[in-house]
Amino acid sequence: MEKWWFNSMLYKGKLEYRCGLSKSIDRFGNPIEKTSVSEDPVRNDTDKKIHSWSESSSYSNATHFVGVRDVRNFISDDTFLVRDSNRNIYSIYFDITNQIFEIDNDPSLLSERESSFFSYRTYAYLKNGSKNDDPPCDRSMYDTKYSWNNHITSCINSYLGSQICIESSILSSSDNSSDSYISSYIYGESRNSNERGSSSIRTSRNGIDFTRRENSTDFDLTQKYRHLWVQCENCYGLNYKKLLKSKMNICDQCGYHLKMSSSDRIELSIDPGTWDPMDEDMVSLDPIEFHSEEEPYKDRIDSYQRKTGLTDAVQTGTGRLNGIPIAIGVMDFQFMGGSMGSVVGEKITRLIEYATNQFLPLILVCASGGARMQEGSLSLMQMAKISAALYDYQSHKKLFYVSILTSPTTGGVTASFGMLGDIIIAEPNAYIAFAGKRVIEQTLNKIVPEGSQAAEYLFHKGLFDPIVPRNPLKGVLSELFKLHAFFPLN
């Protein structure tokens, strides 16, 4: 039988793995070799594999140590398949991020339950580290789904307690109530998902069979917990939503810059208490009475206004950046894809004119899918109107305009004010283009190479100036303004 062997113990509230596989069990569950115990938390031999156990009780001498840092990889959205000599399969599904644990309850899988599934050593035996003859393996502890669930529950509970911020009401309760909370949460979900069916993709890694299970309820779970977690669109890792804002919406796992709302960007860039918004009451009136077979344009505008709390896809106003007075406009991709309609164009134009009259430096943060098709030529006209206002600001008044391109910046915004900055800054891995990949391929009947519209590729083509991550962005802008003779008032 192919097996993942591990023993665990709770020590000072954290989960530690100490004992690996160096033991074989015959078909009647009798130990035939000693299990070594090591205090070394480092994995000694990562290249060794656990081989199939034949009828003659052959064994492998592979030791796998799993430290706290490796727990995430060991129990993170994977299904471990255990196959016995009769080709029966017993699967264990982990999803630590959504707190899901499933064991297939197929009678054919449980028929070989009498053979030992896992070797277990109690905490006292691990603590003593006895080198004498091993005591008989207590197979009754893990020959039922219930006892195995209890063991995994304690592992998951300990891991959550040491690695994830659990609500204080859970942590402050007793061990029993905490176990009960986790148990009911995990197994309640697993029972429901088992009833609704699933599909799986079978893979093999290092000689051991794995199955990545895709439940039909995955989408429902994502929707259910999206108020708690934000999924990275690059590595698909989950980031805790409460902590994401303090980390500037940067993925913990891969450092990818996730989308930010316009309000969060303003809070990031502008000194506290200095933000003064402009034209907040300006709304679109469906100027061309756009006909839609689905949702009417006015209803769609109202829906996005309720969803985002904004009147349209841009916020404009004045404030101070490290004490320097500035005018700033920030587009919001959450409002109809940041599309540029008549209201967006008018608000940006008024902001530029105000900055021109007040001799203020200007920042425009771009995040847009382009012109808004529901407003037709009026939307396209905003490109020329904004560009004309910028020409007066830059060429006649000799003032300083910084354009910041975030992901995505496409269409009419790229073709107008997005590329007119005196300094054009891009965020890492930002998607920047005029036409999207699919549109180009369908129009020209040519394949667009992957990554050819990413900021790092376009930087080497000279499309913009620096690529600046969010962390130092405010300091970089402050230095640029000082270089162009804009200084703090205090």
From Swiss-Prot:
Gene name, Swiss-Prot/TrEMBL: accD
Chief site of localization: plastid
ZnF start-end (C4-type): 232-254
Pathway it works in: Lipid metabolism; malonyl-CoA biosynthesis; malonyl-CoA from acetyl-CoA: step 1/1
Intracellular or extracellular location(s): Plastid, Chloroplast stroma
The keyword Lipid metabolism belongs to this UniProt entry's keyword annotation: yes
Family assignment from sequence similarity: Belongs to the AccD/PCCB family.
PROSITE patterns named in the record: COA_CT_NTER
Presence of the UniProt keyword Membrane in the record: no
Enzyme Commission number(s): 2.1.3.15
PANTHER family per UniProt: ACETYL-COENZYME A CARBOXYLASE CARBOXYL TRANSFERASE SUBUNIT BETA, CHLOROPLASTIC
Job of this protein: Component of the acetyl coenzyme A carboxylase (ACC) complex. Biotin carboxylase (BC) catalyzes the carboxylation of biotin on its carrier protein (BCCP) and then the CO(2) group is transferred by the transcarboxylase to acetyl-CoA to form malonyl-CoA.
SUPFAM superfamilies on file: ClpP/crotonase
UniProt keywords, alphabetically: ATP-binding, Chloroplast, Fatty acid biosynthesis, Fatty acid metabolism, Lipid biosynthesis, Lipid metabolism, Metal-binding, Nucleotide-binding, Plastid, Transferase, Zinc, Zinc-finger
GO molecular function: acetyl-CoA carboxylase activity; ATP binding; carboxyl- or carbamoyltransferase activity; zinc ion binding
GO CC terms: acetyl-CoA carboxylase complex; chloroplast stroma
Annotated protein name in UniProt: Acetyl-coenzyme A carboxylase carboxyl transferase subunit beta, chloroplastic
GO BP, one annotated term: fatty acid biosynthetic process
Cofactors: Zn(2+)
Enzyme class at the top of the EC tree: transferase
Residue intervals of the CoA carboxyltransferase N-terminal domain: 228-490
Binding site for Zn(2+): C232, C235, C251, C254
Self-association state and partner proteins as the record states: Acetyl-CoA carboxylase is a heterohexamer composed of biotin carboxyl carrier protein, biotin carboxylase and 2 subunits each of ACCase subunit alpha and ACCase plastid-coded subunit beta (accD).
Organism the protein comes from: Eucalyptus globulus subsp. globulus
Catalytic function, reaction form: N(6)-carboxybiotinyl-L-lysyl-[protein] + acetyl-CoA = N(6)-biotinyl-L-lysyl-[protein] + malonyl-CoA
Cofactor binding comment, as recorded: Binds 1 zinc ion per subunit.
